[in-house]
Amino acid sequence: MGFEPGSFRWPPLRLARLCREHVSVVVVSPLLLQWFTQSEEDEVRSAGRAIGLDVHRDFCEVAIAQDGEVRSAGRVDTTPEQLELFGSSLDPRDRVALEVSGSAWEVARILERHVARVIVVSPADTGIRQARAKTDRLDARTLARLLAAGELDGVWSPDERCRVMRRRLSRREQLVRSRSRAKNEIHAVLVRRLVGRPPVTDLFGVKGRRWLSELELPLEEIETIGACLRHIEFLDSEIAAVERQIASEALRSAEIRRLMTVPGVNVICAASFMAAVGEIRRFQNPRALVAYLGLDPRVYQSGSAPATGGHISKQGSASARWALVEAAWSAVRQPGPQHAFYQRVRARRGHGIAIVASARKLACLFWFLLTREEDYAHQQPSLTAKKLRLLEIRAGAPTVKGTPTGVWATRQAMRAGERKLAEQAEASYKRMVSDWQAAAPKKKAGASVTPGRASQKPSTGKVARQTTSP
């Protein structure tokens, strides 16, 4: 708490003695307060102009805030040549703000060489979408005014390597969706013609294609199936090419290989996580990472009513959440602490909430593994070696005679021993939770309880095999 002498009717030192028992009190001299205010104004004035850009596909609306006034400055064509010309006309002390869009990062890359700083902001932080009057000119002015007032916090800017991985993963996602649509079209033909379920497991494998070719269907249906099969073959080759590039990049990433030591995590999950997060050390704790990924529950509380948890916030990358949930489904089917955690939450809240909680637990586990630079303690070396060898083959490494996954997959005794160790880790986790629940203090009658909490931190000393285990 700080106040200026003369602001109250009581003497400032007496008022400070009365307040210091409740809050921290600092008595500020008027000259010192004036000096701080003048310093902030001089700093803003020396920072140059604040420029807002409302970026469109064909043009950018420009607005400039200077000396407390905001004015429009026309439009600039969204081409590299015109943006370079526009950037060369700016002062090196200027600052530029623009909203996240498809071309925002390329515009920022061109302008950042000419100005002091380029800030790319989230549309949710500007309030432009909720405005009653919305035009390109007003949007640019709003960005310039907020930037001049220092109320804009730019989103994290990924490096070029991270952007390339994001684009490749997005390309793969679109190709997989197109392949699924082509397969569904063939299934629709079979349903439409009252054809029973295929007698093979993989309808689009060798036996499945042979079965499709032997069906007696009208000519137009046969043409549809043939066209879809050719389209699927083309998409398979495109997906394989993209996955080869992703695998080559993953082999050069120590972080992706470290995440793949966790059972259930493949290269797509690890690459999607790293592409969405980037530098893990910019998150101070696992909770910040969970909130960034949108896996934290929304909390509702008002008045004397207890706080209640709602659905997850779903902020951040949807593809990263999807990858974590898919990895969680695979992880909970294998013995280990993750399986025990899923079973415990499912018994109370159901499988839907339990699998999302498991995905959240995976995100926390990833944070510990990456910040401590260590592999997962409960990994199964044979499965890890198999995943890494398949990753090398997918990246284009030559195959050798013998099993395609190496000697690890052929030693049944070794794999059985690894599974037994995983089962022991799961039992250790269950004992830890049981001891923690027995030693936890009982809730007082009438105390507010926040539902939706999947787990809490165990007491000190009651750990399983590694503190990074979920």
Q: Residue ranges of each PLM-predicted region?
A:
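A detector of single, family-specific signature residues
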Residues: G2-P470
